[in-house]
Regions:
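Basic/polar N-terminal segments that are highly enriched at the extreme N-terminus
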Residues: 1-4
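Short, contiguous alpha-helical
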Residues: 7-11, 18, 28-71, 112-155
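Amphipathic, well-ordered alpha-helical segments in soluble domains
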Residues: 13-23, 50, 90-93
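Generic secondary-structure transition motif, activating predominantly at the C-termini of alpha-helices
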Residues: 14, 25, 59-62, 91, ...
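Acidic/histidine-rich alpha-helical segments that form the ligand environment
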Residues: 20, 75-111, 119-136
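Surface-exposed helix-capping loop/turn segments at secondary-structure junctions
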Residues: 23-30, 97-107, 144-150
Length: 155
């Protein structure tokens, strides 16, 4: 039951994000409101990377805190399509990992530490959803700046 719920949460998180950004396309990938901000493609790439980061971290001894290296990986992404593939693949990897590890593994507490230390693993799925929603909202603003109407994700 817990496993099904966490997989369902990943599914709805992914689907809400994709529904919202449906009107974006490759030509929008490099758009950013100003220097120093993520582009459309980089927002999507960062969101994908963070899904992978959370899933890897929840089954490891600690989360990767080499944020400079993680940021460089995201800033290298310039294609909307490449970022979108990473996003979809990250969610599929997440679902596969949850299934492979099984329900009981979701109840195991994370090691003490600065990132979600001591919480049961399944709580991490809520953090994935929250983080993804944050970037979904940012991309909705970007879409409006591009003259596009973001979709209501819940339809």
């Amino acid at each position: 039951m817990l496993l099904d719920g966490t997989i369902n949460k990943l599914d709805t998180t992914q689907n809400f994000f994709l529904k919202t950004i449906e009107g974006l396309e490759e030509k929008d990938g490099l758009f950013k409101p100003q220097d120093g901000m993520f582009s459309v493609a980089q927002h999507i790439a960062h969101t994908a990377q963070t899904v992978d980061w959370f899933i890897e971290g929840m089954y490891s001894k600690a989360f990767n805190t080499d944020f400079d290296a993680l940021e460089k990986e995201v800033f290298a992404i310039t294609s909307y399509e490449v970022a979108l593939k990473w996003f979809n693949d990250a969610f599929e990897r997440g679902r596969s990992k949850l299934r492979d590890e099984g329900e009981e593994a979701l109840k195991v507490r994370l090691a003490p530490g600065p990132i979600m230390g001591g919480v049961p693993r399944y709580i991490v799925i809520g953090a994935i959803s929250d983080h993804t929603a944050h970037h979904r909202g940012a991309l909705a603003v970007y879409m409006r700046l591009l003259g596009k109407e973001p979709n209501m994700p819940y339809e």
